[in-house]
Amino acid sequence: MSKSARNRTRRNPDGQQGSARSFDFAEYLRTETVGGMVLLAAAALALVLANSPAEELYRTVRDFTVGPHFLHLDLTIGEWAKDGLLAIFFFVAGLELKRELVVGELADRKTATLPVVAALGGMVVPAVLAFAIGHGAPGAHAAWAIPVATDIAFALGVLSLTGSWMPTAARVFLLSLAVVDDLGAIVVIAVLFTSGLSVLALLAAAALCAVYWYAQKRRITTPFLYVPLAVATWIAVHSSGIHATIAGVALGLLTRVRRDLHETASPAMRLEHRLQPWSAGLIVPVFALFAAGVPVDGEALVAMTHDRVAIAVVVGLVVGKLVGIFGSSYLAVKIGIGAKPRGLRWRDLSALAMLGGVGFTVSLLIAELSLEGAAAERAKAAVLIASALASLLAAVMLLRRGRKVRNGDASA
């Protein structure tokens, strides 16, 4: 084969060759900027539909129930998107996180410790701030949990649109932080707001995860084992009362990431390569389409300015996340238990900390579980405003910093 012919071909992680000059729609969807644009477009469409004459049709479709009742899976379309489809996104996130922990940016112990410490700070500080501001107000005893969450899909979407110039370490830090943060939020929901937690279902899920790990260890590759196993694990986690997306994270982290000598790519790399376009181009946008459709009530927006709980949510997400994530990261590095990711400056970490304030869907869920009636509506409005404000501030910080970097400003 001539050199020019070799340049026209490439080999993907599945070992297949394709033309480098032909348009590859899957590769197009793997582009982070494209995925971010599709995600935000879907979220914008959802907000328009939920606040337009089409609101009733939108709500009818979102709330349409489908699924087998005998498995307790008679869920609405919106719930299938939130609990089912999003589990695949979390599986891809788990694959990426496992790869970074074993052979990537997080292989160093101190570098891996930093996002965990940052996530803990990003949960504790917003919760303390929200509790202090809302103390004594109706619902404040439970509403402190609302700003502890970070919406991983939307935070990564904003980063992909405005911070594509940043090194890989930035995405890895935010991904790791958000995964730990979401796991923390799931624990909060399970402990405080779940009445029917099933230990038997949790044990079944743990046993299925053990089978998955053993199959990986034995180098079994057939999808006829893994697909039913993954579905069964998801059903078990869902039946336990815990947010079912944790099944995706668990299986992703249990997938083998080192390739054997006879393999062109590891199972984790192959799965990530195959699922990434579906995750970015379909799964996350569909999730956003049904999750972001929150009616924006003018009266609720006005009323929230006089509601201490709503104010506590905004301050917790916008200020608490920034202070908690950045402050705990700074302390961890200074006392030597964490290491700043390669290629990132403190101002970069401050922008990533600001992205942690994009609570959105997880915070909306906690608001729904912890409050009722008008108080819940005001808290939801506060989550929307806080998430939008955090996104905007982070975008401005990233774009300004990116412009300086591209212009070769040494002090950037």
UniProtKB/Swiss-Prot annotation:
It catalyses: Na(+)(in) + 2 H(+)(out) = Na(+)(out) + 2 H(+)(in). It is a multi-pass membrane protein. The chain crosses the membrane at residues 34-54, 75-95, 114-134, 142-162, 183-203, 234-254, 282-302, 309-329, 349-369, 379-399. Gene3D superfamilies: Na+/H+ antiporter like domain. Coiled coil: none annotated. GO terms for biological process: regulation of pH. It is found in: Cell membrane. GO terms for molecular function: sodium:proton antiporter activity. One of its GO terms (cellular component) is plasma membrane. Keywords: Antiport, Cell membrane, Ion transport, Membrane, Sodium, Sodium transport, Transmembrane, Transmembrane helix, Transport. It holds the Pfam family Na_H_antiport_1. PANTHER family: NA(+)_H(+) ANTIPORTER NHAA (PTHR30341:SF0), SODIUM ION/PROTON ANTIPORTER NHAA-RELATED (PTHR30341). NCBIfam families: NhaA (TIGR00773). Belongs to the NhaA Na(+)/H(+) (TC 2.A.33) antiporter family. Na(+)/H(+) antiporter that extrudes sodium in exchange for external protons. This is Na(+)/H(+) antiporter NhaA 1. It comes from Saccharopolyspora erythraea (strain ATCC 11635 / DSM 40517 / JCM 4748 / NBRC 13426 / NCIMB 8594 / NRRL 2338). The lineage of its organism: Bacteria, Bacillati, Actinomycetota, Actinomycetes, Pseudonocardiales.
